[in-house]
């Protein structure tokens, strides 16, 4: 293997001591042999940096004063050597064959295609709650997929494998709401650089949801911010494309009344139930949203 088959995994770390070792071990023990792991500690106040340094013979460790997620990612990206990038959360866990499966699929497509997958949801203790199934848009045209993306279709960035050449064209931007950084990146790739997206139906990661992580207030705030980013992107297009996207988006959204009713119900359930059951309700709610797309 050569660097054309090297996968660069970037882990932005901030106060992640509780799950960090489990995350690192899941990456180090991948069946795919050609991986570089780059961890960037963003001024953690716990033992995260100490844990990273214990793995310094297996991973590249960088540290900086607290500057936020975008800065950590950009520092990591500036040091990658691989042909593909995998951005991964220090709370989450890969299956042993995650990267091998992603690379095998990526080789079937051009270097302008982002590969992503379904994922399993786990709780604080690592207990599996259920599989989260992404809507399968593999047969859609790039334009129709972009409409879904502009409508707020979320792709779990932790499942993705991104060609490095796309990240040479796009920017990880510092945003007021860091939760939207990945959505902003995907819009850049899709709308500005005509990237395509391909879904693997198998779950390839364990995505950890923390008790109290999401709330009605936070979900509403993020959704509003996502809509702001979307409108900014459309307004950057030439007049004919602006009109085409706005018209198609409005037409698509007219069919979404069922989805929006489900969303409102889901938010009420999350905000009105005790935190110890919210995770389970959330998984049901998330899948209901996807079923109504």
Tell where the protein language model's regions lie, with residue ranges.
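Conserved donor NDP-sugar-binding/catalytic core segment of glycosyltransferases
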Residues: 97-130
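Short aromatic/hydrophobic "clamp" motif used to bind/position activated sugar donors
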Residues: 85
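Glycine-rich, basic loop-to-helix element that forms the pyrophosphate-binding segment
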Residues: 64-80, 101
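A conserved acidic beta->alpha catalytic loop
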Residues: 26, 41-50, 67, 89
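C-terminal subregions of glycosyltransferases and related glycan-biosynthesis enzymes
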Residues: 177, 184, 191, 197, ...
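Conserved nucleotide-sugar donor-binding catalytic segment
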Residues: 78, 137-221, 225-226
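Acidic helix N-cap motif at the loop->helix transition within catalytic regions
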Residues: 18-21, 44-54, 93, 97
């Amino acid at each position: 293997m050569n660097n054309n088959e090297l996968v660069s995994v970037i882990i932005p770390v901030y106060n992640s001591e509780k799950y960090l070792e489990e995350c690192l071990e899941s990456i180090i023990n991948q069946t795919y042999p050609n991986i570089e792991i780059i961890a960037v500690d963003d001024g953690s106040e716990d033992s995260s940096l100490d844990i990273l340094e214990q793995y310094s013979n297996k991973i590249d460790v960088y540290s900086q004063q607290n500057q936020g997620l975008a800065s950590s990612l950009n520092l990591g990206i500036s040091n990658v050597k691989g042909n593909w990038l995998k951005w991964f959360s220090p709370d989450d866990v890969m299956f042993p064959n995650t990267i091998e499966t992603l690379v095998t699929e990526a080789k079937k497509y051009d270097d302008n295609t982002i590969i992503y997958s379904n994922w399993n949801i786990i709780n604080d203790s690592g207990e599996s709650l259920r599989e989260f199934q992404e809507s399968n848009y593999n047969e859609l045209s790039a334009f129709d997929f972009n409409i879904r993306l502009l409508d707020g279709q979320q792709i779990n960035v932790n499942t993705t494998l991104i060609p490095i050449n796309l990240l040479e064209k796009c920017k990880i931007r510092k945003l007021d709401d860091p939760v939207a950084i990945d959505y902003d990146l995907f819009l850049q790739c899709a709308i500005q650089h005509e990237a395509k997206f391909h879904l693997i139906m198998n779950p390839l990661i364990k995505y950890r949801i923390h008790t109290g992580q999401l709330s009605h207030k936070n979900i509403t705030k993020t959704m509003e911010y996502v809509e702001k980013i979307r409108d900014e992107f459309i307004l950057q297009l030439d007049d004919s494309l602006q009109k085409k996207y706005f018209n198609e988006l409005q037409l698509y959204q007219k069919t979404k009344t069922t989805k929006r009713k489900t969303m409102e119900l889901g938010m009420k359930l999350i905000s009105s139930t005790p935190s110890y059951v919210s995770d389970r309700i959330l998984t049901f709610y998330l899948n209901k949203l996807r079923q109504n797309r």
